[in-house]
Every structure is written in C-alpha cells, then in structure tokens.
Amino acid sequence: MALCLTYFNKDYRLIILATTYSDFATWYLQLYRRFDSIKIYKMTKTIFITGASAGIGKATAIFFANKGWKVIATMRKPENEKELNLLDNVTLLPLDVTNPAQIKETTQKALALGDIDVVFNNAGYALLGVLEAITDEQVVAQMETNFLGVVRVTQAFIPYFREKRAGLFITTGSSAGVMAFPVSSMYNATKWALEGWSESLSYELSEVGVGIKTIEPGLVATEIADRTIFATHPAYESLTSKFMALIEHGEGVTTAEQIAEVVYGAATDGTDTLRYVCGEDAKGLYAQRLANGDEAFRKSIKDMLGA
C-alpha cells in the first residue's frame, strides 16, 4: 500500500516527506531521535548549592547528581573536597557566603556554565549557648552566615531568574525557625529571620514567575557536633546541661540523606508550597505547637527541662 506524507513549507510549496510506509518509518525514527535528544537536553536541570562541603549540602549534591542533575557545589575550600570532585556532573566552585564580592564573582562563574534552575541556600551553622556568654563577634558571624549570606546569594540570582521568569530558591531553615528553644537564642534568631524573609519574598517573586521554599528539619545527625559552636556560662550550667542532654539523646534524629530527599521533592513537586517541616522530631513538636498553642508549648518545654 502506498503512502504520501506531505506538508507546505513557509513558501507554500508542497514538500513530500514519504511515499511508502518504509520511508515514513525512517522519517519518523529520525524525527523521534531528534526531538528525544532535545527533550533530554531540556530536562537536564542544574542546581546551585551553598555549603556543600558537608552535611545536608553534600548529601543534597550527591542526591541530585544521582538523579541526573547538573550540580554546582560551592564551599569555602573546594580544593579540599575528595568526594564530590569525582562525580562527572558536579562542578566545584569556591564560595564564602560572608564575602559579598566573592558571591558576585561565583554567581557570574556559575551562570557562565549554563542555565540554572534551582538555588539551594544551605550554608550555615549553629551557635548554641546562653546570650550572656556569646560575644558580639559571634553574633555578627552567625547573622552574616545564616541570614545575610542567604539574602546576598538570593539577590545575586534574582535578576537572572526574573528575566527568564523561571527558577526556584530553596533555603535550609530549621524547626528552630518556627519554634524557639533554650540555649540557642542567636541560632533561633537567624532561622526565624529566614522564615519571615522567605514568606514576604514569596509574594514578590511570584510576580516574576520565581518560587521560594524553606526546608525545616529538626535535629540532623551529621551536624550536631560538626557544625555547632557552644558558648557556656556557669550561672546557666544546669539549664545548658539538661538541654544538651535532650539534644544528644533525642529521638527522631534525621540523616542528611533524608533531608536531601526532601529538598529534591521540594525542587520537583511543581507546587508553590512554602514550608517543608521534615524529620519525625520536628513534625511532632510542630504539630504539638499548632494543636496546643504557643503558651502551652512553652510550658511543655519548661516541663521537659524541669524549669
């Protein structure tokens, strides 16, 4: 049986594509391969990650790379990285989020590598201890890294996302950004700041087709000791000891790999959900606070500490 597959080109000339089923099959296969390669190219997405040398940042870089994403993993000293540098689809760049000039420089280098779809603001650490024992330098350093670093990296990428009317910012917040705990006032302050900032910014960014989300984990196993600074004072030794005991022996501690999976879900679920509370400990405490109210929650924390 004969077949005639034709179309008119832009000059309205009749173009014959195939006259037999064999010709049609050949033409269709060529077309499929062409568009399939284009589809694959377009579906290869890129994530830019800060604080990728350890913990959640590193686990997220590995998780996304294993999912076929291109990953731009940034850290203060990429020359010391011995694992991510072995992955073909991971590029390492230097970035200290407390250095505004380097933020601009690294952003430009990252954008020169190609299209970026997601920026994951993850760099941060915990400053724990009573306020009386914390120095002004420690306060400034905590705010510079946990809050201002996120703000500056976001500012650097907004024009790019705005121009293409697409893109997503994801920030590592904390359950300490929706609930406050003792002996962590400055850490709480940075995470609460991120929560208000993110919610307000979500209205602005939605006007230009850009999204923003926050990940709110509870205790994360790899970061309890590795990314925490302690400031102690003898007058508060009892409270500090009780609280640290709760942290060290707490149930429902989450791994960095589990958080990385939540980040991936946030990046790919196609929703405009703002907050992702994750980890059994965080989910339980947050549900308790919502159900019982602020004052009842505060009382429960005091009761746990025997205060």
What are these regions (language model features)?
Residues 53-54:
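Conserved glycine-rich cofactor-binding loop
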Residues 95-105, 136:
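The beta1-alpha1 cofactor-binding region of Rossmann-like NAD(H)/NADP(H)-dependent oxidoreductases
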Residues 130-131, 135-140:
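Substrate-binding pocket helix/loop in short-chain dehydrogenase/reductase
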Residues 132, 179-185:
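Active-site loop immediately N-terminal to the catalytic Tyr-X3-Lys motif
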Residues 154, 190:
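Active-site helix of classical SDR
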Residues 174:
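Residue(s) in the substrate-gating loop at a strand-loop-helix junction
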Residues 207-273:
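SDR active-site lid
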